[in-house]
Amino acid sequence: MQVKETRFAAVAGTCLACMLAFAGVAAVASGEEQKASADNQAREVIADAAFEYDQYGVIDASYWADKFPLEYNSYLMTAMDVPLEYGEYIAEGNVDTTSVGTDLLDGDYTSTKVNFLDEDQYPEIKTLGKGYGYAKYYTEPGGHAYSVWVVANNGRLGDLSESKGKVSCYACKTPQVHFDAANYEGEGSYWTQPITEYKDAFTENVSCANCHENEDPTTNAVLREDWIRAMGDDLDETTVANAACGQCHCDYSMAPTVEEGSDAPFESGEPVSPYYGGLASMNAEDALAFYDEYGFSDWTYASTGAQMLAVRHAEFEFNYGANPSPMAQMGYTCADCHMGTVTDEETGVEYTDHNIQSPLDKPELLASCNTCHTDLASEVASIQEDIDGRTHELGLRAEQFIFNFEDKVAIPDADGNLVFDTDTALANGLTEDQVARLQEIQRYACYYWNFAAAENSEGAHNPDMFNDLLEKGNALLDEADEILGVSSIVEA
């Protein structure tokens, strides 16, 4: 691909600066540097870093700390967003060698995160995701400073020394994996290589190199190749900053095995976003059509035979996709709402804050929002209460539908686990066509639910899009209820 010939051409030999640490405004350090332009700073950094590269190029954010301390130190603040089980991990005597900024916690690793599988949260996930990693472990996410640690400690992969996971699990957790993929010359697809062989290979968390250009580090860029394909002609200098966020904050799945001679626009195991036509195709319907075309599923639901799909958090689609959010239509960027420009109290220098958070958690940003909104916090809370509640209701209804479906088509195996059985389905009065349609409904309805449930704003980004997804999910379950002759609606 062209991106390999240009974007990664300098890796492992003549790479100058893989990325500027969090450029975006002309933020400078001190003294004479405060008078330098962003371009001059970039040249200085490149000169200083020319000999500080490894096989991936210069990807370590700490290389830029002395030149861009304001951006770098604000990035370290993402360590304040502690993952749920991090404190327990440290208390057990483990040493974390990859996360950064944890010294800012002063030994207090208390987390405010929740386990979404708990009974007072969204326990339906255990049923809707049965057979997939989501049913094993699903917590509120922590900060970017912990992204590599999370891969090894998220409860889905287990011990990486014995895990069946693949390198693709790191796709949105470290920039290193993309540089490695671009230069891979081994057997088969890089993305399907066993994670056991790479468990100690990655040390850099989500940082500078994920979002900033190599040769001109004052600009943004996209690392993930398939996202470049999915964006198509819509990836340009006006969209690249949002697309840099979107390459991870989008829906993607790990591609199935690609047969030799296939015209599939991806390789085996590659993280794939299910879109062809740029922004106009970025909606749930086009995604489902893409997955259907390639016969793709993340897993087979054992008790019903449905071919299931898992959705990652599709913030980009909710904001900039086929049905843009109100804020996107007004021209706002991800950075406007989740980063913002702040002024250093000591030097008076303005810089882009890289402690990426909800604007509700940033007083300066919230004050700016409230120049248009009367009370943004209350507005968001009202939207979230409504949409998150109805998303939960759809999840509970989809769960009950699965139970109803199982009653018609499943029998216990030798270990007592329910498995799909065609003869049982026919004996219970279903036709083969009805079974196929019910399996399709499970695939689609759960996808609509998952598309909404996994998006981190809980409705705030794009209420209209959430409403559309929930309506479509419920309409499918209405059809399923008619086929099965029993209601899936769960009374509150």
Regions found by a protein language model. Give the residues of each.
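Hydrophobic alpha-helical membrane-insertion segments, chiefly the h-region
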Residues: 14-28
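N-terminal Sec-pathway targeting helices
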Residues: 2-17
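Primarily the internal scaffold of c-type cytochrome electron-transfer domains
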Residues: 26-141, 182-205, 210, 215-336, ...
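Membrane-entry segments of alpha-helical transmembrane domains in multi-pass membrane proteins
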Residues: 150-164, 191-204
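Long amphipathic alpha-helical segments
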Residues: 483-492
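A cross-kingdom signal targeting lumenal/periplasmic-facing segments of multi-pass membrane
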Residues: 151-180, 185
